[in-house]
Amino acid sequence: MTQQEPRGEPGARAPETQVLELVILVGLQASGKSTFFRERFAATHGHVSKDLIRNNKNRNRRQRKLVEAALRAGRSVVVDNTNPTVEDRRPLVELGRGFGARVVGYHFDSETRGCLARNARREGRARVPDVAIFATAKRLVPPSRAEGFDELYRVRPDGQIFEVRAR
């Protein structure tokens, strides 16, 4: 939350306002990103996930349009995808910056073995091929503040809870 000074009244403070946020989740499939969204952000942020855009030929373009629409409407939004590389995250960070949003990253620092086990418990479309998890693990580059994040956190699943630490 931020405080703003009203025009014409030096030193006066406006009521607290909600800061526009673009939250970017980064991690392997089945690392807990969607569960984390539901627990931490569902009540306050929009949700954009390529998993929900299955039939679209250009999911990246559709994702960008959905994020842009939320930010343009003044709504904070979470991008819930693997976002494994700097190149995958860069357009999102730039988009958030363009709207003056605070860009926050959550890196899900999960072991591949744990993700495979959680994935095996999934059913239907929620389950991804194991090869997809291995492929993402090979490409995954942990995010850094140098990419333009205002805040960056490391998330580790710990049983039924998430351990979140600033990076």
Predicted segments with their positions:
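Conserved GTP-binding G-domain of TRAFAC-class P-loop NTPases and closely related GTPase folds
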Residues: 2-26, 31, 42, 111-167
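Alpha-helical structural signal in soluble globular domains
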Residues: 39-40, 91, 95-99, 139, ...
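Conserved beta-strand scaffold positions in the cores of enzyme catalytic domains, especially
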Residues: 45-47, 103-105, 151-154
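Amphipathic alpha-helical transducer elements in NTP-driven molecular machines
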Residues: 60, 64, 86, 109, ...
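Short, hinge-like loop/turn segments at secondary-structure boundaries
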Residues: 64-68, 96, 121-125
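Mid-chain, well-packed structural core segment of small domains
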Residues: 85-118
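Conserved substrate/cofactor phosphate-moiety recognition/catalytic segment
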Residues: 26, 31-87
